[in-house]
Amino acid sequence: MQSNTDSSGTSGTYSQTVGLLYVFNLIVGTGALALPKAFQSAGWLLSISLLTFSAFMSYVAATFVIEALSVANAVLSKKRRVEYDDVVVADGPSTFEIAKKVEVSEMASMFLSKVSLVFSYFAIIIYLFGDLAIYSTTVPKSAMNIVCSTINATIVKSSDPCHESWPEILTRMTVYRFFVIVFVVVVCLPMVIAGITKTRHIQIMTTLSRWAAFILMISLATMQLSSQGAAAHPPAYNFHGFGSLFGCAVYAFMCHHSIPSLITPMRTKENVFGKIAVVYGIVGVFYFTLSLTGAFAFEHVQDIYTLNFLHDDNTSLVYSIIDYFLALFPIITLTSSYPIIALTLINNFKVVKDILCPKTGQENESLLEADNQVEDNDTDDEREARNGNPKTIFDVLVPTLVLALPTFLSLLTDDMLLLASITGSFPGVAVQFAIPCLLVTAARKHARSVLNFPVPRKNNSPFQSRFWIMLISSWAGFSMIMVLLNLVGVKF
């Protein structure tokens, strides 16, 4: 897909401040809802240390993606000059200007070997599967807790009845599973079939609701701490909670797959590395405030933090409205995002099939087509009809698998913290750390050997030494081992 932004004009562009705000909104997603529980489980000092280091590693990887993006633009610039026999303009710093959006998948196709390319696609696919499982768990669990009796009074079990007056068969888990089926089959399946994606109005609505929800949660927890004192006293560190904390930390700083879509339209990229570092710092402070207030304000933090604000019946009307708004917040935001992730996942399967079993004349698609899905009005059926390609059993099995597997995982467990930690720890590590390292290593080599010009200092990541790539790789490997040991029950 081609970008709507013309490289020579300003159509579709925005100021650097707006672009940085988009980056902030992209990072601060619903993954933050699992952080307070992870903070309380792992301890406040370990949580602050790990989240700080994870944020720094995530920032380093983000600069790698931006540097690879500049090299990709130089490759396209050289290709255009060759096509038009423009031998006057030589390779130079200006060719590395980020003027055209090149998705992560396109950069992978430019720079990586077939093995690394397939690895990148599979990493994204597994990560998106985890994303869908988190979505199809968070929404039904929020709905179940709205319908069932409040969870703040006592610690409840999934086997407890939804209401004391209801039949025993209608346990909280039964009601939760009912909402899983309703959410996937009744709500999401029609949107996926119809190819419905997020519109600008829905994007504005979800952004406003996200800001309102996070500000309300921080304010309410702070008020509770100031009036009632700390309800819980988390330890400074608890290494047994390392696994869930690390996975949530990776998941909370995930933005790398969408960096090209946000950086390219900026009218100026002056000092972009430094300003993105400021964004990461602000996000870190925001996460610390949200997580620490929640970890100390509530005796038992829920894995979906918004559920802690479902008060007893004796609260005022204003508090009740706020509480139910917070409980509905994940339902509103995730329902609008589910079809985008599902359609992106379906497209990724098709791309992997084309890589492994190539067809003559088959058009390559982007690895992450969330933005392109909005711009492309043709459905898959219309494209296939135009190209004369009838539906195959693969075209039927893939959408079925995309919806069925995450739904099955959600039916097995309602532990969103577990799903977020696994998704962030394994495929998330590949998406956030491994793929950027592979891209920047190959892009730097391509710039020296093929373009015969080093990446200009303006477009260079501040982390040029191979030490940083080795550090990220070592950190990712160590963390994955720690997570695996925690999952199998090894005590520290």
Swiss-Prot record:
Residues 40-45, 136-177, 232-238, 297-325, 413-415, 488-492 are extracellular. Glycans are attached at N152, N314. It is a multi-pass membrane protein. One of its GO terms (cellular component) is membrane. Keywords: Glycoprotein, Membrane, Transmembrane, Transmembrane helix. The chain crosses the membrane at residues 19-39, 46-66, 115-135, 178-198, 211-231, 239-259, 276-296, 326-346, 392-412, 416-436, 467-487. Its main location: membrane. Pfam families: Aa_trans. Residues 367-387 are annotated as: Disordered. Residues 1-18, 67-114, 199-210, 260-275, 347-391, 437-466 are cytoplasmic. It is found in: Membrane. Residues 367-382 have a biased composition (Acidic residues). Belongs to the TMEM104 family. This is Transmembrane protein 104 homolog.
